Amino acid sequence: MTDASGSERLKRTKDISESTPPSSLPDHLIRATAAEGKIRVVGLVSTQAVQEARERHKLSYVATVALGRAMSAALLLAANLKRRQARINLQLKGNGPLGGIYVDAGMDGTVRGYVSNPAIELPLTPESKLDVGQAVGRYGYLHVLRDLGYGQPYTSAVELVSGEVGDDISYYLSSSEQIPSAVLLGVNLDSQRVRAAGGVLMQLMPGAPASLIPEMEARLAKVEEFSPMLAYGGGLRELLQICLGDLDLKIAPEVRTIRFYCQCNSDRVKGALRMLGRDELIDMIRTDKGAEAVCQFCNEVYRISEDELRSIVAEMSANP
């Protein structure tokens, strides 16, 4: 399920921007249970993380919404991992012009991501929405890699359902992990900034009656205006109260910080250069007078000077 509101309606987001400031809520994640513990809930605000991705990659409107949804989805999945160093990798590879969507998120609340064609823009749908499904493509696969921190990651894949991201994540959870789930993802933006972004994941606990599945979906439908509500200043707790307040909602006190973060650094780039071999580095010194590398996940540019390359070659010669 995806936010069917102003998050994809450009006219409406402009109207909102004239009367209200963007959400000032810091990015965070909370957990809860409902229906006497039979439903587990994760909710998050990812506004600043998505805005940073938009700025770093110079994303178009539709690319911002697509990547923003995927970033929130990966964070929701990572929230249920057990070890702090555990991570989730999402890859959505459809037949649309956006190309692939790649996201890496950790149980620690860090997230990064990129799309293959960040500048792509498409006409709005007849309902004046950004056409994320058309941009991603309705034919292709969602790949989910889970690294639980034990050195043996495992991957599963399902066919895309709609390319809208939320539907595809729900289908993955129900078919691959066999956990009945309802997912709501939203990104609200205007020409200047991401006004609000986030998501909610509801899942049945083991042993819970199947009759709660339509109940979960109906409850999430109450907050289809999810991202505009965040843009207006509503908090996650208030939003969860709207859809689950009368169903024995219990919100955990822990609040986890969410942030865009990439592990790349100059030392890693130099390590990758060493893998090219001494002869290749000598050729770089002669022809390019240095080296340049760009991290795909965060678009950070690393420039390695000629002197630094010579130092690397000298180290390799001294320690063959």
Swiss-Prot record:
Pfam families: HSP33. The keyword Zinc applies. Residues 1-27 are annotated as: Disordered. InterPro entries: Heat_shock_Hsp33, Heat_shock_Hsp33_C, Heat_shock_Hsp33_N. One of its GO terms (cellular component) is cytoplasm. Its main location: cytoplasm. SUPFAM superfamilies: Hsp33 domain, HSP33 redox switch-like. One of its GO terms (molecular function) is protein folding chaperone. Residues 1-17 have a biased composition (Basic and acidic residues). Under oxidizing conditions two disulfide bonds are formed involving the reactive cysteines. Under reducing conditions zinc is bound to the reactive cysteines and the protein is inactive. It comes from the Bacteria. GO terms for biological process: protein refolding. It is found in: Cytoplasm. Disulfide bonds join 262-264, 295-298. Keywords: Chaperone, Cytoplasm, Disulfide bond, Redox-active center, Zinc. Belongs to the HSP33 family. NCBIfam families: PRK00114.1. Redox regulated molecular chaperone. Protects both thermally unfolding and oxidatively damaged proteins from irreversible aggregation. Plays an important role in the bacterial defense system toward oxidative stress. This is 33 kDa chaperonin. It comes from Synechococcus sp. (strain JA-3-3Ab). The gene is hslO.
